[in-house]
Amino acid sequence: QVLGAGGNAALGIPPATSIPELIERIQGPEHLRATMIVAAPLMHGTGQFSAIISLNGGGTVCALPSRKFDAVELWNEVERLKATNIVLVGLAFSTPMLEALEANPGRWDLSSVRSMSSSGSMWSQENKRGLLGHIPQAMIADSFGSSEAVGLGASASAAGMEAQTAAFMLGPNTGVFTEDGRRVEPGSGERGLVAVSGFLPMGYYKDEEKSAKTFRIMEGVRWSVPGDWAEVNADGTLKLLGRGSVCINTGGEKVFPEEVEEALKRHASVRDAVVVGVPDPRFGERICAVVEPEAGVLPTLAELSAHVHSQLAGYKAPRELVVVDTIGQ
């Protein structure tokens, strides 16, 4: 290889490179090679896209041997393989991961882990803080997007600098628009639909109606609008509210289940929670919380409603409670 370097080109002195050095560059030095464990199913976009990206970069992709997610098995494999990256999908994975670490302090050598990444489901600030307490050298990447709208937003967390739940930096091709196609101004407090432009799918196969609803022309540009509602903070960051198709209408007020679920999960007696709307003769719908409690405790509707009310508007507090053994996520 002959290449005139900037500092030596005028002198006619090319830098020398050996064949072994070129081969090492192609293969990638050992310390830069990524070993990724994809804990998420490969049929899910998060697992599939992450695996393809890693393989295209020359990395190694590993799947867990069991058909059902087992956090202890994950940490065993991380230690055995000296994994550098872990791919998961929100709290359904990160909650048992943290519980396993808390129950087995110091059991695993996790010094190889450089990053943990998630997309497709909520990942709370509190859980991120807990995981980083056990793996302080790692970075956490929390991405917001969908199969038809990749790259809507992202947040990064490190030990002592955990990003807020459902708060994201907007991607370069992302905007937030009202239903009539007007762009939402930062800091206005106005709600809008998150949209992304750029490389987009042609549409949904044999579903012209859904394609027309999702892929829209706004400001002379084609956008993918999957249906997620958000506000734009004054600093330009995005506050995700939730998917409009599951929005609960109670007495004319819109309530996004995700924000109520997030509040419920902050209660000490709640391990997991799902919020749904149930028919109500007066308000049209009322908020029902389905809760999986921590072991040995039984939360009441009164205490959970008061807890949610302390963080959100009163009409967003659950009016009905169902306690189950497991949410099953």
Which residues does each predicted region cover?
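Gly/Ser/Thr-rich phosphate-binding loop
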Residues: N56-G59, A83-L88, L98-Q164, F168-G175, ...
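Short hydrophobic "strand-cap" motifs at the C-terminus of beta-strands
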Residues: A39-A40, V89, S118-S119, S143, ...
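General small-molecule cofactor/ligand-binding pocket signal
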Residues: C62-L64, A141, L321-V324
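AMP-binding/adenylate-forming catalytic core of the ANL superfamily
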Residues: N76-E79, I86, G145, G192, ...
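Conserved AMP-binding/adenylation subdomain of ANL enzymes
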Residues: V2-M36, M43-V87, A100, N104
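Short beta-strand-to-turn element immediately C-terminal to the catalytic PLP-Schiff-base lysine
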Residues: G4, L152-S157, F177-T178, S197, ...
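Structural motif corresponding to alpha-helix initiation and N-cap regions
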Residues: A71-V72, Q125, R183-V184, P257, ...
